[in-house]
Amino acid sequence: MLTYMEVHLYFTLPVLALLAFLYKPFFTTKDRFKYIFLCTVAFATASPWDNYIVYHKAWSYCPECVTAVIGYVPLEEYMFFIIMTLITVTFTSLTMRWTLPSFFIRPETPVFQSVCVRYIPIVGFLTIAAKAWASSIPDSHPFYGACILWYVCPVLALLWIGSGEYMLRRWKAVLFSIAVPTIFLCWVDQYAIARGTWDISRRTSTGIMVLPSLPLEEFLFFLLIDTVLVFASCATDRAHAIVHIYITPMNHNKVSTWYMDFFYLCWAFLQTDQALSGETLSDLDATWRILREASASFYTASSVFSFEARQDLGVLYGFCRATDDLADNNDVSVPDRKKQLELVRGFVRQMFDSKHGHPDIDWTQYSGSIPDSFIAAFRSFTRLRDVLEIKAVEELLDGYTFDLEQREVKNEDDLVYYSACVASSVGEMCTRVLMASEPGGNRTMLKWTVERARDMGLALQLTNIARDIVTDSKQLGRSYVPRDWLTSQESALLKAGKARELGDERLRQIALKMVYTADDLNLMASRAIDYLPPSSRCGVRAACNVYTAIGVSLHKANGYPDRAHLTKLERMKVTFRCVYGFRKGHQGVQGDRGKSQAFTVI
């Protein structure tokens, strides 16, 4: 005999524990709200409904198989309401999190199409509910199935109002999120019925079996309840995305309260796609297109962050990518590229002139001088105005100017200056975005954390330069190795694209000097990761350790590889270990450093 508590101990709780482990690195405060809200609603509505069902003897249990009974329902059944909700919502979150919800909000959809898609299913759900209500006569064969339909269909109709079109646009993920938990729970149900833990009355059901020991009504129950939970999860994700895109930029400097957050979510739930600003979403889409085309690795790697952090990091990186492309576009003359960068500087100054309120920028002044997709990225970038500091943005532009003017890196100070411009600035901006996107970061340590982020950016750039000595020489005729590290002949060879003629031993010596400096910087900088919001720590640690592993690869290599890198499998291993906590802290170069020694960064 299988007790109801054993059903939980052997089946539902282990699966829930596995899902919780898999999802833990991605858990955010938004998820906490989703779990609490959906579990509360599920428990509050399912409890009276299930008592009604058991009272009318549609469902029964083995008295010896339960721990206690509250009302007409076993304690374990109340547990099941919560466990089932957690299993389905967690699995749905794991399935859905890899793509931003904003990609499926489309204000350009024709109104007539939206009206049809929105209201025809609602009418269908409510019609089914009304007919089911009329058919739910106690002690009749349709009773149990009809009770399931009138319990579920009005909720489906309500949820369809706020997320119907959204779910149709990502129907594969929705169906998968419904199917897998349904199959698992039906299997558990079938197993328990076959062993007498509970049973379904033949008098109040159709008697149709989907599988042996699995009545049609039980299959219908799990299918429809899982559908409700997936619909609710999607509706919550869509509402959070709308609030983050349209409300959050206006409230960065306001104290958040739970009742205002709930009000905004209700407002967002009721918004049709057409009621939202199409330009805002099209600008975000244009920004992400830039990233998909220019940096598939960032596009993929960003998925380890929360929706909110990923959206804003994407906006930041899209701006960096667009400005970098402007500076590097060899189809445009250097004087014209300098003019474009001056336009960008003017935009940045305008953006930060008025610290609060919507930025008053005349975008027509950039048309014709800057590609439209880049202007869209700039418009999206304005949402970060209250998060970033102008100094870091201007510092990034100084780095582009350094490259455009082909300035020589004369000494270590120049190397640090250039690296700070193009990388420390980005590290600072990323940290400010992460701290603003999610509660839980240590804001009292913000200044120190930002300084360590700048150190980390510097370390990553030094690793980048160390890796690309030959590549930069061949492809750009450029060297970022300090001139005073080289002889006149070595400097000339690097500029002539003949870096290989320095020999493996010399290239390795130069590269490792930067790698060891980066390693020393990493040692302190990596400690600041623990001051970031919890949901961001694993992603940042993974990104940093992937780059650190490149330095380790250079250290271990025999000679100097043309471009040291990690294989896709190696990157996946590093990321998995960092995300799931198998690797923490500094993972740098181990062993004797030989002749190459780190230089001092002031």
From Swiss-Prot:
One of its GO terms (cellular component) is membrane. GO terms for biological process: carotene biosynthetic process; carotenoid biosynthetic process. It is a multi-pass membrane protein. GO terms for molecular function: 15-cis-phytoene synthase activity; geranylgeranyl diphosphate synthase activity; intramolecular lyase activity; lycopene beta cyclase activity; squalene synthase [NAD(P)H] activity. It is found in: Membrane. It comes from the Eukaryota. Its main location: membrane. Keywords: Carotenoid biosynthesis, Isomerase, Membrane, Multifunctional enzyme, Transferase, Transmembrane, Transmembrane helix. It catalyses: all-trans-lycopene = gamma-carotene; gamma-carotene = all-trans-beta-carotene; 2 (2E,6E,10E)-geranylgeranyl diphosphate = 15-cis-phytoene + 2 diphosphate. Bifunctional enzyme that catalyzes the reactions from geranylgeranyl diphosphate to phytoene (phytoene synthase) and lycopene to beta-carotene via the intermediate gamma-carotene (lycopene cyclase). In the N-terminal section; belongs to the lycopene beta-cyclase family. This is Bifunctional lycopene cyclase/phytoene synthase. It comes from Phycomyces blakesleeanus (strain ATCC 8743b / DSM 1359 / FGSC 10004 / NBRC 33097 / NRRL 1555). The lineage of its organism: Eukaryota, Fungi, Fungi incertae sedis, Mucoromycota, Mucoromycotina.
